[in-house]
A protein has these predicted regions:
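Generic recognition of stable, solvent-exposed alpha-helical segments in well-folded globular domains
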Residues: 116, 122, 150-153, 168, ...
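Short, contiguous, well-structured surface segments enriched in hydrophobic/aromatic residues
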Residues: 56-59, 85-92
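Short, positively charged
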Residues: 171-191
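Sequence-specific dsDNA recognition surfaces
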Residues: 60-77, 92-123
Length: 247
């Protein structure tokens, strides 16, 4: 079979692998996990030669260095649903880097006030799906239009601290988190927990590609900012239209 042939060839050549298999240094094994999907990002790293163009830094190291902060949200219970006008943001409310304009569940001002200081939501924060199914890894940027929210426990809140040594911005980070290189890592590190899939604390093992060129970081940040700003305008216009139709 082709797989066996490739294996024997790999003993004598610089075989990097293909869709049928790839080689991995034993030192790169993670907690004896042998599932090939857990190491697909190594293949991408070699193919894209990311080591030459990017700093590959784990989220855990970015936290230790004070570049980013990560927290998770809270549950309010079903009895809180429909008690007010404050959005309770769940995994299904996140799409295309934004929070949907019509979240399914709204909660009271009192519940919001009891959690606002703890959750400390600010424009520029990133919400990322932590648990669920196909939505894990999906991201949204907090804006001035939706900073008054409560977000659930199945979401991470990621904050980029300004003036960090990498020049990293929240706009660049949300693009990096949405890249194929990071998506494959998220898929590889997502495991079933009881009856729900979860990324959990393994988010700290994910490698973030940060460009060595500050101009690239600035250009990508501007692209993302423009994309989000345009989407916000379209979202708010559609919301206004749906209100004005009854005026």
């Amino acid at each position: 079979p082709t797989v066996v042939k490739n294996y024997y060839n790999s003993q004598n050549t610089n075989y990097n692998g293909n869709e049928l298999g790839f080689r991995l240094n034993v030192d790169d094994l993670d907690n004896r996990v042998l599932a090939p999907r857990a190491y697909l990002h190594f293949v991408d790293k070699e193919a894209l030669k990311l080591d030459d163009t990017h700093k590959l830094i784990t989220i855990g190291d970015l936290i230790k260095q004070g570049v980013i902060e990560i927290n998770t949200g809270d549950e309010v219970g079903k009895l809180a649903y429909g008690t007010g006008n404050i959005p309770f943001v769940r995994t299904s409310d996140i799409s295309n880097w934004l929070i949907k304009s019509d979240p399914k569940h709204l909660i009271s001002e009192d519940i919001y006030n009891s959690l606002a200081q703890k959750q400390d939501v600010k424009p520029g924060d990133i919400l990322m799906v932590k648990d669920g199914s196909y939505l894990i890894g999906t991201c949204a940027m907090i804006t001035d239009f939706d900073k008054k929210i409560v977000y659930q426990s199945h979401l991470y809140k990621i904050r980029v601290n300004n003036d960090n040594k990498y020049g990293l911005t929240s706009y660049y980070l949300i693009a990096a988190l949405s890249s194929e290189f990071v998506k494959k890592q998220i898929f590889a590190k997502t495991f079933s927990q009881d009856i729900i899939n979860s990324l959990g604390d393994r988010i700290k093992d994910i490698l973030i590609p940060i460009s060595n060129e500050q101009n690239n970081i600035s250009n990508i940040s501007e692209m993302v900012k423009h994309s989000i700003t345009s989407s916000i305008k379209a979202r708010e216009l559609s919301r206004k239209a749906s209100i004005d139709v009854l005026s």
